[in-house]
């Protein structure tokens, strides 16, 4: 794998939001079926939610350490649409009252502003993520906003696309 040393953007060019993509595996660990999340969502960021510890020494100097991140990402609205395997899977978890299944998702973040189509884009695969349904309802359509809590059980790698489907390859150890 080629080592990336810069973004695949021109000097001073801002990365379009659509280049940061979140996929959820709605298949099995053996037969992955990646669902791209974000259709109809105008704004979604991965909030890092850092845990910090600050100490002021006897000289009055404050130092702050980041001890961990608890990253999460909200998708609101997440409108129920025909053909949405993720919405159907979450709806089944809701109606079957099996919330323990909400913490067993594989989520992949693809950074399409790092890498190339030929060599692959930088990505990370996270296992045992939680996808929480925050509500269900709406006004004109049935929305089911979700929040993904990332696990930090992650593997870095690259993604290439075959027939519009992402294929993840872990980095060599």
Predicted feature locations:
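Intrinsic-disorder/low-complexity loop/linker signature
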Residues: 1, 29-30, 116-118, 164
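A broad "ordered helical/assembly scaffold" signature
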Residues: 2, 33, 41, 51-60, ...
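Solvent-exposed edge beta-strands and adjacent loop segments
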Residues: 2-82, 128-141
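Extracellular/virion structural assembly segments
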Residues: 59-126, 156-162
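Mixed-charge, glycine-accented linear interaction segment located at domain edges/termini
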Residues: 125-173
